[in-house]
């Protein structure tokens, strides 16, 4: 089943020719079982998006070569791939306990091999407290395993049972 999501790139400034500074808004939702409702899963804003792009240039991502040949050009596809894996991981977590783990590992691989270059931020622990590094770190760190239990409990045992067993859903 397709995951309903949106990526909105808001270009804030042109740093130099074909180099842009932007904010990325990411949203994702999942269906609530037995209803026509959608439940919001992700609503995040990433202010650290700097990338190089020339009109009509294809966005290509290679998981084996995250940095590509040019860090500026590789950054935007790496950011999109990172958030795609995070969304898929959270979606799987909402249907199966710790079901998203393989996708979180893929997102972590992108962080560990992220493009590095002039003006590129958001991939390192010292780039702030609300960035791509800390998001995947908090989801993959064993100390925070309760996050997966809560996510699964809220969506699968809670919202998905509101139609057929409201008492059980509210106790979850």
What are the functions of these language-model segments?
Residues 16, 21-129:
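Acidic/His-rich structured neighborhood in mature extracellular/periplasmic domains
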Residues 1-21:
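Start-of-domain marker
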Residues 137-172:
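A cross-kingdom marker for long, charged
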């Amino acid at each position: 089943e397709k995951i309903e999501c949106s990526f909105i790139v808001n270009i804030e400034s042109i740093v130099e020719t074909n180099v842009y500074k932007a904010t990325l808004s990411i949203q994702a939702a999942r269906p609530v079982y037995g209803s026509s409702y959608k439940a919001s899963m992700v609503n995040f804003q990433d202010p650290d998006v700097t990338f190089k792009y020339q009109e009509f240039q294809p966005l290509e991502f290679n998981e084996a070569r995250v940095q590509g040949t040019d860090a500026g050009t590789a950054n935007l596809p790496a950011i999109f791939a990172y958030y795609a894996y995070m969304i898929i991981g959270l979606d799987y977590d909402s249907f199966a306990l710790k079901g998203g783990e393989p996708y979180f590992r893929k997102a972590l691989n992108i962080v560990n091999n992220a493009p590095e270059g002039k003006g590129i931020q958001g991939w390192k622990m010292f780039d702030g407290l609300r960035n791509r590094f800390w998001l995947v770190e908090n989801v993959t760190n064993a100390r925070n395993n309760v996050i997966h239990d809560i996510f699964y409990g809220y969506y699968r045992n809670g919202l998905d049972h509101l139609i057929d067993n409201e008492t059980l859903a509210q106790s979850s």
